[in-house]
Swiss-Prot record:
Residues 495-504 have a biased composition (Low complexity). It comes from Alternaria alternata (Alternaria rot fungus). It is a multi-pass membrane protein. This is Cytochrome P450 monooxygenase ALT8. Heme binds at residue 539. GO terms for molecular function: heme binding; iron ion binding; monooxygenase activity; oxidoreductase activity, acting on paired donors, with incorporation or reduction of molecular oxygen.
Length: 599
């Protein structure tokens, strides 16, 4: 609204200049309107960034982060450190947060309201979920890449889309996809093993790995790989086959066009960071209009993906489509695309948006979690060895025959491998792929008993909640899978609308007693884990993502030993993290691997 007011003021200035005629000949229309525009913008920033938060905001009584706002050192951390890190440090330094809300100031002094307590989170995500929507700067930034799918839809549009798509992500259906995921994991392991042998024999061919280190002399020596790239290609193949019935072949071909296109979109750069900051200060349409190389590359990449999605939809509408390859998925009638088409609720362009959403969000987030899982395995060889022992004792050698017995695979992974499930839960807790997200109050409303004016920017920070010492005990900042093995369930009562797999737990508030390895009070609410959010806007694909991580991690650790490559930081805080859609390592993650015989 402020931007429109400034533009309107500038237009009025132009009209006034024309009306006054000769009396304003010394001043061009452009400079006159520019002066008015600049002045109005300046006044608005002074009001919104200085006067309002200091003297008029009804939120000024809340606990506020000291020295934040107006280019202060604390505020600049929000733009120079990994997302969620400053907020996490702020919260853990506070003695208490009575209202469950913490206020801080952004780069120009604008108010931000960080939701901290499980009770406040429940109010925002469940009780008043549609009163807090994604702000325009988030929607505009993501819409180009994700399309206007279920992730970005709001209100009745979101309810309708989620209702149509939910059967494709029901846990019962996801269990039927375990063999498909396992077959992709087998393909990944086989391909990696073969390429290790190729590189070990000093072949000049490098179809999978990139390395600037000396290559191994025999198969038991280490070679260096970019595991982040391999994770991304594997998850892209899984979402392709299990999600929309398409085989992309990204594992087989490292130069796969779709994979390379997504690499181009998610590639971090100083230019991308600068454009992101400008979107906070200037009209978003203006920033996207700027003739920058980054904008041009993203626009070309998005057009490529949209064209591919249209082609997939046309092929899916053909009568013979169901009888073609991957009938094991297509015959269920429950992959994302077949369900969406059968519903008749989407136009072809709306279907394109849905496919774009699940292709991008469905593979990038899980790939990020898997990359960090391998990183933590390198840092904790004891955890890696313990997990490998469980995998080898519970799952058959590769290649296996689970394609003919899907229920056995799902049952084994979900209920027969407690340490694998504990590691995966801890990965999602400790390394949420999306560490911070935003909401905006669409009207004057409340969070618990605190009045929140319309337009207030709300910060939901999974990294903060997931590592909060008041919820997780004194070892909240440590990676500790054993905390999940010490969880003692009593009579559980779930009052949230979303569910998840039995092995990973549901979502919602429940009456359970938890103890961690430090014998201190731990989380008593599912809102202490915010990786997939909760309520009507929780991640529709969380069961899919959890199964994907468990299967791929089991296969990788079962076959290979992992160590950090030379030059890869041994401290998590020293790893340069992308400030893009997900918190993945900015330059990939280079690790050393070798085959461990016997599985």
């Amino acid at each position: 609204m402020a931007t429109l007011a400034c533009v309107g003021a500038a237009a009025m200035a132009c009209a006034l200049a024309v009306y006054l005629g000769d009396t304003t000949k010394s001043m061009s229309y452009l400079s006159y309107s520019g002066t008015i525009l600049f002045g109005c913008s300046g006044l608005w920033y002074v009001w919104k960034g200085l006067l309002w938060p200091a003297y008029f905001s009804p939120l000024r009584h809340l606990k506020t982060v000291p020295k934040s706002g107006w280019l202060s050192a604390e505020t600049l951390r929000l733009y120079t450190e990994p997302r969620g890190v400053p907020q996490c440090e702020w919260i853990n330094k506070l003695d208490s947060v009575p209202q469950g809300l913490v206020r801080y100031r952004s780069i120009l002094g604008f108010e931000r309201l960080l939701v901290v307590s499980p009770e406040a989170l429940a109010d925002v995500l469940v009780n008043r979920s549609y009163e807090f929507q994604k702000p325009a700067f988030v929607v505009t930034q993501l819409e180009q890449i994700l399309g206007r799918g279920v992730l970005l839809a709001e209100g009745n549009e979101h309810r309708a889309q989620r209702r149509v798509l939910l059967p494709a992500f029901a846990f019962r259906h996801v269990k039927s996809l375990y063999p498909v995921m396992w077959s992709v994991a087998e393909h990944l392991i086989t391909s990696m093993t073969e390429n290790i042998r190729v590189e070990s024999s000093a072949s000049p061919t490098e179809p999978v790995f990139s390395s600037d280190e000396p290559q191994a002399k025999h198969k038991h020596e280490m070679i260096t790989v970019n595991i982040a790239d391999l994770c991304s290609r594997a998850t892209l193949d899984i979402i392709g086959i299990a999600g929309i019935g398409q085989e992309f072949g990204a594992i087989r071909n490292p130069n796969n066009a779709l994979h390379q296109t997504y690499c181009e979109i998610f590639q971090p750069s100083k230019e991308a960071t600068l454009l992101g900051v400008l979107r906070l200060l200037l009209p978003i349409w203006f920033v996207d209009w700027l003739p920058s190389r980054r904008n041009a590359r993203v626009q070309r990449a998005v057009q490529t993906i949209r064209s591919l999605c249209r082609q997939i939809i046309q092929e899916e509408r053909l009568p013979q489509a169901v009888d073609e390859s991957h009938s094991e998925v297509a015959s269920t009638g429950k992959n994302i695309l077949t369900l969406a088409i059968a519903s008749g609720a989407f136009t072809d362009e709306a279907l394109v948006d849905q496919i774009m959403t699940f292709l991008a969000a469905g593979h990038e987030t899980t790939a990020t979690a898997l990359t960090w899982a391998i990183y933590i395995m390198c840092l904790h060889p004891g955890i890696q060895e313990k997990l490998r022992n469980e995998v080898r004792s519970r799952l058959p050698k590769l290649p296996s025959t689970y394609n003919s017995a899907p229920q056995n695979l799902a049952k084994t992974i979900d209920t027969g491998m407690p340490y694998l499930n504990a590691v995966c839960q801890e990965v999602f807790r400790y390394f949420p792929p999306i560490p911070v997200t935003f909401r905006e109050a669409t009207k004057n409303t409340f969070i618990l008993n605190t009045a929140v004016p319309a337009g207030t920017k709300i910060v939901l920070a999974p990294r903060v909640t997931n590592r909060q010492s008041t919820l997780w005990g004194s070892n909240a900042q440590e990676f500790d899978p054993d905390r999940w093995l010490c969880l003692k369930k009593q009579d559980a009562s779930i009052d949230d609308s979303s569910a998840a797999s039995p092995s990973f737990g549901g979502s919602g508030k429940r009456k359970s007693q938890y103890t961690d390895t430090h014998k201190e009070p731990s989380t008593r609410s599912n809102f202490a884990t915010m990786t997939f959010l909760h309520g009507p806007r929780s991640c529709i694909g969380q069961s899919f993502a959890k199964a994907e991580l468990a299967i791929l991690l089991a296969a990788l650790v079962g076959r290979f030993e992992f160590k950090l490559a030379r030059g890869t930081p041994e401290k998590e805080i020293d790893v340069r993290v992308s400030r893009g859609a997900t918190a993945r390592p900015e330059k990939g993650l280079f690790v050393q691997i070798r085959v461990i015989e016997g599985w």
